[in-house]
From Swiss-Prot:
It comes from the Bacteria. InterPro entries: ATP_synth_OSCP/delta_N_sf, ATPase_OSCP/d_CS, ATPase_OSCP/dsu. PROSITE patterns: ATPASE_DELTA (PS00389). F-type ATPases have 2 components, F(1) - the catalytic core - and F(0) - the membrane proton channel. F(1) has five subunits: alpha(3), beta(3), gamma(1), delta(1), epsilon(1). F(0) has three main subunits: a(1), b(2) and c(10-14). The alpha and beta chains form an alternating ring which encloses part of the gamma chain. F(1) is attached to F(0) by a central stalk formed by the gamma and epsilon chains, while a peripheral stalk is formed by the delta and b chains. This is ATP synthase subunit delta. Its main location: membrane. GO terms for cellular component: plasma membrane; proton-transporting ATP synthase complex. F(1)F(0) ATP synthase produces ATP from ADP in the presence of a proton or sodium gradient. F-type ATPases consist of two structural domains, F(1) containing the extramembraneous catalytic core and F(0) containing the membrane proton channel, linked together by a central stalk and a peripheral stalk. During catalysis, ATP synthesis in the catalytic domain of F(1) is coupled via a rotary mechanism of the central stalk subunits to proton translocation. This protein is part of the stalk that links CF(0) to CF(1). It either transmits conformational changes from CF(0) to CF(1) or is implicated in proton conduction. It is a peripheral membrane protein. Belongs to the ATPase delta chain family. Keywords: ATP synthesis, Cell membrane, CF(1), Hydrogen ion transport, Ion transport, Membrane, Transport. It is found in: Cell membrane. GO terms for molecular function: proton-transporting ATP synthase activity, rotational mechanism.
C-alpha cells in the first residue's frame, strides 16, 4: 500500500475503528462468519467504485460534508451489503481523504484484515500465510501464468476466474479470496509481488517477522526448526521462515529479513573473496 498523507492516515484509523466496532457488534458465535462476509463485501464495494468514477469521486469529495457522503454511501450500498459492512463503508465515506485512491486502497486493506481475522479465528492464519507465499513463488516461476495474470488486456474478472480455477480446492477459502481479489486489481504490481505482500500482511497480523531464505539445497525439518529458533532468538519475536531452493548459491544460505541480508552462501563467500583480491 502506498504511503499516505496525514489526513488519509487519520481517516484510515477512524475507518479501522469502525470495522472493529462492526465486528464487535455481532455475537461471539457469528464473529468469524461476519469477518469473512465483511471482507468479501468490502472487496465488492471497491470493485463497484473502480468501475464508477463519478461515484468514487462523490464519496471522497471533501467539498461536501461527511454526513452527505455517508448518506450517499447508504443509498448506493444499503441494499447490497450487510449492516456491518455498510457501517464501515459509511465511516470511510464520512472521512476526509487526501486523494480518492486512498479511500479505495484503505477499503481493500480493511477487507484483507477482516478476512485474515476470520482465518485467525479458525486457526488458519499460518496456513494462509504459507499458501500465499508459495503461490507467489509458483507464479514467479511460471512466466506463462505470470503473463496471463498480469496482462492488462484481460479484464479483471477474467484473471480472477483463471486464478480461482487454479486454486479451487487446493488452498483455504481465505487465501483464495485474498489472491483472486489482488490479481484483479494489480495496478503496477507483479502478481508474485502482490501475493508476497498478502503473505507479509498475514504474518503482520500475528506479529511475526518474515525471513526469506534462499538455500543451495532443501532444508530438513530439523534444519528448518533450528534456523527458525535461531532467528526467533535474534529478533526477539516469532519468525516465519520461507525457504526457496537456489542451486546457484553452491552451498549455505542467504537470509533476508526486511532490509537486512545475511549471506552465508558459497557463492557469496566466493564473491567476497574475488572482491578482496582486486
Amino acid at each position: 500500500m502506498s504511503t499516505m498523507y496525514a489526513a488519509s492516515r487519520e481517516a484510515l484509523t477512524q475507518t479501522r475503528a469502525a470495522l472493529s466496532s462492526a465486528l464487535g457488534s455481532v455475537s461471539a458465535g457469528a464473529a468469524t462468519a461476519a469477518a469473512a462476509q465483511i471482507g468479501a463485501e468490502l472487496f465488492s464495494v471497491v470493485e463497484i467504485l473502480d468501475e464508477q468514477r463519478t461515484l468514487r469521486s462523490a464519496l471522497s469529495d471533501t467539498s461536501t460534508t461527511g454526513s452527505v457522503r455517508e448518506g450517499l454511501a447508504e443509498r448506493v450500498f444499503g441494499s447490497k451489503v450487510s449492516a456491518e459492512t455498510l457501517a464501515v463503508v459509511k465511516s470511510a465515506a464520512g472521512q476526509d481523504w487526501s486523494v480518492t485512491s486512498d479511500l479505495l486502497n484503505s477499503l481493500v486493506l480493511l477487507g484483507r484484515e477482516s478476512l485474515l481475522k476470520a482465518a485467525a479465528d479458525q486457526g488458519q492464519l499460518d496456513a494462509v500465510e504459507d499458501e500465499l507465499f508459495r503461490l507467489g513463488r509458483i507464479v514467479a516461476g511460471d512466466p506463462k501464468l505470470e503473463q496471463s495474470l498480469s496482462d492488462r488486456s484481460v479484464p479483471a474478472k477474467g484473471k480472477r476466474d483463471l486464478l480461482s480455477k487454479l486454486l479451487y480446492g487446493k488452498v483455504t477459502a481465505v487465501s483464495e479470496a485474498l489472491a483472486t481479489q489482488a490479481v484483479g486489481r494489480l495496478k503496477n504490481s507483479a502478481p508474485a509481488d502482490a501475493f508476497d505482500e498478502l503473505s507479509n500482511l498475514a504474518a503482520a497480523q500475528r506479529k511475526a517477522v518474515v525471513a526469506k531464505v534462499r538455500s543451495a539445497a532443501p532444508l530438513s525439518s530439523e534444519q528448518s526448526d533450528r534456523l527458525t529458533a535461531t532467528l526467533t532468538r535474534t529478533y526477539g519475536k516469532p519468525v516465519t521462515v520461507h525457504v526457496e531452493v537456489d542451486p546457484e548459491l553452491l552451498s549455505g544460505l542467504v537470509v533476508r529479513v526486511g532490509d537486512e541480508v545475511i549471506d552465508g552462501s558459497g557463492a557469496g563467500r566466493l564473491a567476497a573473496l574475488r572482491k578482496s583480491l582486486k
